Amino acid sequence: SEKNCYNIIIHGGLIMSNEAKLSARERIEALVDANSFDEIGALITKRSTDFNMQEKSVPGDGVVTGYGLIDGSVVYVYSQDAASVGGSIGEMHAKKICNMYDMAMKAGAPVIGLIDCAGLRLQEATDALNGFGSIYAKQVEASGLIPQISAVFGTCGGGLAVSSVLSDFTFMEKGAKLFVNSPNALCGNYTDKCDTSGADFQSTANTVDFVCEGEAELIAQIRDFVSYLP
């Protein structure tokens, strides 16, 4: 309905309170050429009703997907919405990302993932776990066929950290966090001693290729990088 569309667009434009962060939609708007983005799957939401999920509003199932242009070249983009259940991976969330890969492989165009994700959506249990596997499988299928770019803006936790490493090129904002397990999971460690989730550590470990000072610089570097792709 018109009301649902309005709520989805408004929610996708929300920012996390007290944080100087762009919203999921604002990141896409800054990345692609003006007025070039076509959203796909805007009305899709979560299917699960377990653990009171039926009471939660999850517009777009926590991810904005579609395609647009960067300097006239087609790119497929997904941007996770941290204002919607933390941008966590659920069944339909994963299906939307996989659909981007299918469309991108058919078109021979890059996939750009703008990551801001709390990890697995626990309420969806094995359906969410299967979503991770589906995303990994699509990335492996796309490897060598199309460029895959990941950009870590906020949190990239749990299984999605594997997805960023499977990409061909990974960008990371200086204040972002990338981890499978918390740094505190290491015996005797704490973040002040060695923040294994931080950009400095991840760049030294060659997990990420480019570290940027802020979101604006990160987006500008992706745009510049895409201009070099054939």
PLM regions: where:
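Terminal-region recognition feature
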Residues: 2-149, 155, 160-162, 166-178, ...
